[in-house]
Every structure is written in C-alpha cells, then in structure tokens.
Regions:
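Active-site-proximal alpha-helix that buttresses catalytic centers in soluble enzyme cores
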Residues: 1-252
Length: 252
C-alpha cells in the first residue's frame, strides 16, 4: 500500500508486527492513511504473519526512506528483525527511528481509551502488554505503566497476554481481591488481533480498545518521521553514507 503524493521527500515505511485479524490489518492501514495526509508517501510493512516485509518494501522504493517501527516496546523485532530487514533490502539510504513506545503521548491515548471503556478515577488499572523475553522490552513496559500511573494518579499493575508472567487474568483477580475496586484493562496494543481478543476473558469490569487510530498517535508518528527527514538532510549534506548503514535516531 502506498499513500500520499509528496514524492520529493523520503517515503515513510511503517513497520508493524502483523496479524491475521482483518480488523487489525485495516486499522494499521487506516493509521498509515492518516499519517500520509501530513507527510506524503507512506508504506506499511510487517515483520511477521503477513507481508510485505520491510526488505521487500525498501527494495521496491529504491529511494531514501524513514522506517518507523510501530512497536510499543523495543524487543526482538526492533533490535533484530528490523535491522536485518533493512540490511537485506540493499537500500543504502534508510533511517530507522526508535520504536513508538514507551512515550507520554501513548500514555495519554491509553487514558483516553480507558475513559471510553467506562473507567473513572478510583478504579484500578491493569496494563495489558504482549510480553517479551527481551529484558529491554520489559523495562519499556514498566516505563509505560509508570507514565500511565502519573496520569491516573494511582498505581498501574502489569499483566502479559502472550509471553511472560504474570498473566492478565491473574493480575485482574489479584487487584480486585486486594483492593475491592472495579478493575479496568488498558490494552497496550496497537491494533485488534489475537492478543486483544484474549482480554475479553480477563475478568475485568472493562477492557479498553487498543491504541488504534488516534489523533495524538498520528501526530507522534508525524513527529518521528520529520525527525528522520532532518537526519536524511544532515547526512546528505555531509556526503553519501556507506551502503547498508542503519542510522538510529534519538527519541524526540
């Protein structure tokens, strides 16, 4: 998929995990469309489940690109899959931004989704993350929970949906037993899919929607892209870069 028409600027390649859920795929496509309205040519690639892969998209472009890993924590996909895909593409002019999360913007979107689900001040919150075996990703999830806790004014517990312990249903049950309060699940997932569907059986009083297409998330993506474009310009001014070089930009 390609959207936008500002061909004079580097293309944006939004890299997501991938899902068999048609609703999830449509959501990622809709997010790309919203971003494209501000930045121009935007492509979507997936590292798992379905294609096209990042390397396929970057080979097709054969032009400067800014790659944004649309992951909420920096685990295996961010540290291993994305760099490998960039190298395999043979595209010499690719700038890779940090992963989307954790970020205060995402915490604000999580709070909005919780309120949509019926959460009120005083209700307990469990942050539901996919999970990872990478300690760096788990650290990112803890940071995300701390950011959300600053906004709710209360502790936010963490539960995992796919990898790691404790599992979301166990955390929900423990928090309810200990506090006697209503418990809501904040879905720390980008889109609908298998992981989000599991949250319906978590036993919570309410489950928030995934981050999805939200104006603040779109603005965050646009900001990351523009930081990447500035890096492209700086590199171009300094001369050509070696082939297969991957540049990781600082978090803005």
């Amino acid at each position: 998929m390609m959207s936008g028409s500002n061909s004079g600027r580097p293309a944006l390649v939004l890299v997501a995990h991938g899902t068999r859920s048609p609703r999830g795929v449509e959501l990622v496509a809709a997010l790309a469309e919203e971003v494209a309205a501000s930045v121009g040519p935007t492509r979507v690639a997936f590292v798992d489940v379905l294609g096209p892969s990042p390397s396929e998209v970057l080979r097709e472009l054969d032009a400067p690109a800014v790659v944004i890993p649309a992951f909420l924590a920096s685990g295996y996909h961010v540290h291993t899959d994305v760099p490998r895909e960039v190298a395999d593409s043979g595209n010499a002019d690719v700038h890779v931004t940090p992963a989307l999360g954790p970020d205060p913007v995402l915490a604000a979107v999580l709070l909005h989704r919780l309120r949509e689900a019926g959460w009120q001040s005083g209700d307990a919150v469990v942050l539901a993350a996919a999970g990872s075996s990478d300690p760096r990703a788990l650290t990112d999830v803890r940071r995300a929970a701390a950011m959300l806790a600053e906004l709710t004014g209360d502790r936010v517990e963490i539960g995992y949906v796919a990898t790691g312990e404790p599992r979301v249903p166990d955390v929900v049950a423990r928090v309810r037993d200990e506090s006697g309060r209503r418990v809501f699940v904040a879905s720390y997932l980008l889109a609908h899919g298998l992981f989000h569907s599991r949250l319906a059986d978590a036993g919570a009083d309410g489950v928030a929607e995934p981050l999805g297409v939200h104006a603040e998330l779109v603005r965050l993506l646009v900001s990351r892209y523009r930081a990447g474009v500035e890096a492209v310009r700086v590199t171009a001014g300094a001369g050509a870069a070696p082939r297969h070089r991957r540049r990781v930009l600082p978090v803005r």
